[in-house]
Amino acid sequence: MQPQFVLVGFLVLLGLGQNARGAEPADPVAFKHARVIDVWEAYADRLTFGQGQTLALLDDGCKLSLPEWSQSDGDLPKVRVSYDSVDDDDDPKHEGRGYHGSTIGIPSSVNYKGKRGVAFNNQVAVVRALECCHCNVSDSKTLAAGLQWVIDHHERHRITAINLAPVDDLEHAEPVATVIDAKLKRLRELGIWVSAPAGNHNFSKGISWPACQPNCFAIGAVKPGKDEVHLDRHAKLDLVVPASATSSSNAIVCGTVLLLREAIDKSGYDWKQDGPNRAAAMLTILQKTGTEVHDPTSQLTFRRLDVKAALDHVFERGRR
């Protein structure tokens, strides 16, 4: 074999090894199924994977000293800003029964010791908006305050999406009117993505609040590695995503929409053909490029997230 070919082969193998070591998916099976890993490879030279965007995590607080949040392999601190709408201060530490918010941002955002979330170069805004993610509609007041904080500060902190993480673990076939509804409506008008997990109880006649509300996208799940709908499902579901829990499926799609927004901006894609605002248009893109999955339990057909297909659609039809 000629020396130059040996050298080229060595460099290729070296590069592949570095990529493998430097990009451990936060959820390998789910990321492969949703084609997140394909996107990392295909668009490595075109996307920054979240740089310049902030994802707001509205949950039950966070232990900010955890290395996943206090350290980052990226150029910027992972946590850009924090707020507690329960106590009206900037310390979102867990109190009472809180626990969930310390991990909910991992699938979307982690960038620590080689482990990566979908949009690993993003920043997060940690908002403690209630005591525990397993909530009640009585938590709507502090949730509304957290949403209002995002409305007031989204431009300063470049917040483009919200992971509205709580679930009330009930089977709502219809919306439940509360004070969060006006905030959700305003966020939709601003084009800010807001989605929530459907719930994890195998309900088929309804889903959890606040996912059941207008202007909040409801995210369900398929089993990782298999297009089989599981956990809560209902006609209200907007999208299903590979994950073992709907909180994780919602986290994955929240990271995805940061990539999709960047792709729209860089390609010059005319999103207005898909919806009246950026958030609605992005859902349309994710739905029409997603894989059809029929659910025998509910007799409904859902669209399963295919991140690569969504980005391909945008770049192939862009004006730049």
PLM regions with names:
Residues 59, 192, 206-267:
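Extracellular S/T/G-rich loop segment that most often corresponds to the catalytic His/Ser-adjacent loop
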Residues 172-194, 209:
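Catalytic-core regions built around general acid/base machinery
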Residues 17-22:
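Boundary at the C-terminal end of the N-terminal hydrophobic targeting segment
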Residues 147-176, 197, 268:
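Short acidic, glycine-rich surface-loop motifs adjacent to enzyme active sites
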Residues 35, 157-166, 262-320:
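C-terminal subdomain of the subtilisin-like protease fold in secreted/lumenal serine endopeptidases
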Residues 6-15:
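Bacterial N-terminal signal peptides
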Residues 25-124, 130-138, 142-161, 249, ...:
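Active-site core segment of subtilase-fold serine proteases
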Residues 60-64, 130-134, 167-172, 200-204, ...:
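Solvent-exposed loop/turn segments at secondary-structure junctions
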